[in-house]
From Swiss-Prot:
InterPro entries reported in the protein's UniProt record: KdpA
Keywords on record: Cell membrane, Ion transport, Membrane, Potassium, Potassium transport, Transmembrane, Transmembrane helix, Transport
Superkingdom to which the source organism belongs: Archaea
Signal peptide: none
UniProt gene name: kdpA
Subunit record text: The system is composed of three essential subunits: KdpA, KdpB and KdpC.
Topology term for the membrane: Multi-pass membrane protein
MF (Gene Ontology): P-type potassium transmembrane transporter activity; potassium ion binding
Protein name: Potassium-transporting ATPase potassium-binding subunit
Matching HAMAP family: KdpA (MF_00275)
Length: 585
């Protein structure tokens, strides 16, 4: 259909002049499109959660069986929590060890030309980061890694971490769904996650990205001569589309270039920006929607969708209007909004919802410089990190949201004098203990390192911003590491041994310690038999429970950090807007 020139002119003028309204419309377009695709995918994910063969199993079944024979495992070998979790840890440990050695000695391996290498601390941080699905990159130069390391280590760990997360979610759902005392076979769950879900979607997105102009080549760089100089500039190239696809589908977030999705070769235009947003939200959101199908309670799935959409809309609008208003005190953004650190082809609204989506999931990708966001804008982005990525990553979102659900059911049941039950299963002391440990561990992994870091004098010399901004930057850094998100605000030198090793330990604990707590709960549920409901428990599918769940998430998640938020982003915000409080301080 060819639209009349008058209509094209009208809408072009509307979006150019009515920036506030058009920005809100764009945000809802993003959310609407990703909701549609996630809903369609939820039926497919539900089949995987119910251990039913998908339509791809005719193609992938023989491949899965082949790898199971090689490692001597099969679906029939069901594991309890201890065996399942130990195999998960060992598999990840040896993958991480091999990856560490490959990067350390990459100069002796094929396709190592122009690779400058990494220090031991940066190597450790990089491997742990990609192993834990965090992708916190303390390096920005693509020449640090060889093609071999980029392809087999970085891309390989992206698949491994995503598959591990979804396998853990399969085990958790199986624990709620069955009563045989087993939560599955890790290796079978991992292979199904890769070949039935993650790999097919990655191939599809790779093809679309290549067609949209994202490079996919073994050429190391392209030499160009800008019109304003006679000097030749070498622009790095490589297998960008492949890495970009699994970066988003696997909710990894680590980019081929230091600017991540802010670099034109990773994210050329508005279409690829929308595609990447849909890519990193489709599996986490589809997994939550699939729960309503798996447990035969569509209202429960819709309730989870509404809760997540609340955070998307609230955070997205908060970040957008924070950037749209700019910084009046500094006379920034009167007419354009705060375009500092943003691509002009993408704009304020698309950058804002992209950043919010990247922190509500565990993706951590960025299409702009977060350090250039206004204090109000960064608060909107930061909320997702402080809530431990409520939508989560591939699989881990299901684990994270259920920790809040269990805690909310327990508190809500006490308030009205009913039995705490979830899916007709009694919530006992073990479930409460480990869900509480899971919810408390995340703030501790953020607050303790932040306090220690502020007491080390020589580290302050690497910061470029004033005190309140330093607290915000450290809060963002450690919250990103603890939630396995990987987005980085910057503003100080992160590539130094202290931060490389400290962030590495935080990422490991934030990934495997919490996953262990969550799988203990799955094992506990797996030995319980569902009871007939006689209106003895609260309804977990209605709007009242949704409001209670949102309240619990905000209270547990944000109050833990309230003093730091006040001393960091809120203090910066008051200064920027020249409020009375800011003037007094």
């Amino acid at each position: 259909m060819i639209f009349p020139a008058e209509d094209v002119y009208f809408w072009s003028k509307f979006f150019a002049t009515e920036r506030a309204v058009s920005g809100v419309i764009i945000i809802f377009i993003y959310l609407g499109i990703t909701s549609i695709f996630s809903y369609v995918l939820s039926f497919y994910i539900a089949k995987i959660y119910r251990d039913e063969p998908t339509f791809l199993r005719k193609l992938t079944g023989s491949v899965i069986s082949f790898f199971e024979k090689i490692i001597g495992e099969s679906e029939n070998h069901q594991m309890e929590f201890k065996e399942y979790f130990i195999n998960l840890l060992l598999f990840n440990f040896f993958a991480g060890l091999i990856s560490f050695l490959v990067i350390m000695y990459q100069k002796y391996l094929p396709f190592s030309y122009y690779a400058t290498g990494m220090s031991p601390s940066l190597d450790f941080n990089t491997v742990v980061s990609f192993l834990t699905n965090t992708n916190l990159q303390h390096y920005s130069n693509p020449f640090r890694l060889s093609y071999f390391s980029q392809t087999f280590v970085i891309t390989g760990l992206m698949f491994l971490s995503a598959g591990t997360g979804f396998a853990a979610s399969m085990a958790f759902v199986r624990g709620l769904r069955t009563d045989v005392g087993k939560i599955g076979n890790f290796y079978h769950d991992f292979l199904v996650s890769i070949f039935d879900l993650i790999l097919p979607l990655s191939i599809l997105v790779t093809i679309i990205l290549i067609l949209a102009g994202v490079p996919e080549t073994i050429q190391r760089f392209i030499s160009v001569t800008p019109f304003f100089t006679n000097n030749t500039v070498n622009i790095p190239l490589g297998p960008v589309a492949t890495l970009e696809a699994i970066k988003n589908i696997g909710t990894n977030g680590g980019g081929f270039y230091g600017a991540n999705a802010g670099f034109p070769f990773e994210n050329p235009d508005w279409f690829t920006n929308l595609l990447e947003f849909v890519s990193f939200t489709i599996i986490p959101l589809g997994s939550l929607m699939a729960l309503g199908i798996v447990f035969e309670d569509r209202k429960f799935g819709r309730m989870l969708y509404y809760v997540i959409m609340f955070f998307f809309v609230f955070d997205g609008l908060f970040a957008f209007f924070g950037e749209y208003v700019g910084v009046p005190f500094l006379h920034i953004g009167y007419y354009t909004g705060n375009m500092l650190g943003k691509e002009t082809a993408i704009g304020v609204s698309q950058s804002s919802i992209f950043a919010v989506g990247a922190t509500l999931t565990s993706t951590g990708a960025s299409d702009g410089a977060l350090v250039s966001y206004t204090p109000a804008g960064i608060i909107g982005v930061l909320i997702g990190l402080l809530l431990n990525d409520p939508l989560g990553g591939v699989g881990t979102g299901v684990l994270n949201i259920f920790m809040y659900i269990i805690f909310t059911v327990f508190i809500g049941s006490l308030m009205v004098g009913k039995l705490p039950e979830l899916m007709s299963l009694r919530i006992g002391s073990k479930e409460i203990k480990y869900s509480t440990l899971s919810l408390v561990t995340h703030p501790l992994l953020v607050v303790i390192p932040l306090g220690i870091t502020l007491m080390i004098p020589h580290l302050s010399s690497t910061f470029v911003n004033p005190n309140s901004s330093r607290i915000t930057e450290l809060l963002y850094e450690f919250a990103s590491a603890a939630s396995n998100n990987g987005s980085e605000m910057g503003g100080f030198l992160t590539n130094q041994p202290y931060f490389n090793y400290l962030d590495g330990v935080i990422m490991l604990l934030g990934r495997y310690l919490l996953m262990g707590f969550q799988l203990v709960i799955a094992q506990s549920f797996s030995i319980k038999k569902a009871k007939v409901q006689y209106l003895r428990s609260i309804d977990t599918s209605n709007s009242v429970f949704a409001l209670l769940l949102i309240s619990a998430m905000l209270i547990i998640g944000l109050l833990s950090y309230f003093p730091i938020i006040v001393l960091g982003p809120l203090l910066s915000w008051t200064h920027d807007f020249s409020l009375i409080v800011g003037a007094i301080l």
